[in-house]
Design a protein with these regions (language model features):
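Short, Lys/Arg-enriched N-terminal segments with co-localized hydrophobic residues
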Residues: 1-4, 25
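Bacterial N-terminal signal peptides that target proteins for export
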Residues: 3-15
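Bacterial N-terminal signal peptides
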Residues: 13-24
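Immediate post-signal peptide segment of exported/extracytoplasmic ligand-binding proteins
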Residues: 26-37, 64-71, 160-161
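Extracytoplasmic "Venus flytrap"
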Residues: 35-53, 75-82, 104-105
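Signal peptide-proximal N-terminal region
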Residues: 50-72
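Structural motif
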Residues: 69-94, 149-154
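Extracytoplasmic ligand/sensor domains, especially the bilobed periplasmic-binding protein
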Residues: 82, 96-161
């Protein structure tokens, strides 16, 4: 279990660091605002939320990104598309975040993409693999995992062998 948590910490640190790099070129504010919309209905989901919150708190305590503190806003989308769209809208227009991270469900991420693109807020997608996410073609959308089309090919080959 410890090895899995270490890997999760690394992944979330990389995601938050990537968000910082994207933001640094976009925002010269004193505080970097990061908005997150994840499915947090299970122990694993809650752990993801705690992990990213703890990572940001640690960075704010020990150091910053280019001297800028990080302000984290975390919402639970419950893997429901209407909540994801509401979260993305709130993050972009009300909370005025510099970057959105999420969602962890492709069915939620797909309808969030047009919201981020229209608001011109970069969106980093750490989990969703649906190929249509990046097919929508926005310069503001960055998907971390490989497309599900690739996984299907690999799984098919593995099954055949």
């Amino acid at each position: 279990m410890g090895e899995i948590m270490n890997k999760l910490k690394f992944v979330f640190s990389a995601i938050v660091f990537s968000a910082g790099l994207v933001i640094t070129t976009l925002a010269q504010a004193e505080t970097i605002k990061i908005g997150v919309s994840f499915r947090m209905l299970s122990d694993v989901g809650y752990k993801h939320g705690e992990l990213i919150t703890d990572t940001v708190a640690k960075w704010n305590k020990e150091g910053t990104i280019n001297g800028q503190k990080i302000d984290l806003t975390l919402y639970n989308d419950e893997c429901k598309s209407e909540k994801g769209v509401a979260n993305a809208t709130k993050l972009a227009y009300q909370d005025k975040v510099h970057v959105i991270i999420g969602s962890s469900c492709s069915s939620v991420t797909l309808p969030m993409v047009p919201v981020s693109a229209k608001a011109k807020v970069p969106q980093i997608i750490p989990h969703s693999t649906n190929a249509d996410i990046t097919k929508k073609g926005s310069e503001y959308i960055f998907r971390v995992p490989v497309s599900s089309r690739f996984y299907k090919i690999v799984q098919g080959k593995f099954t055949a062998e």
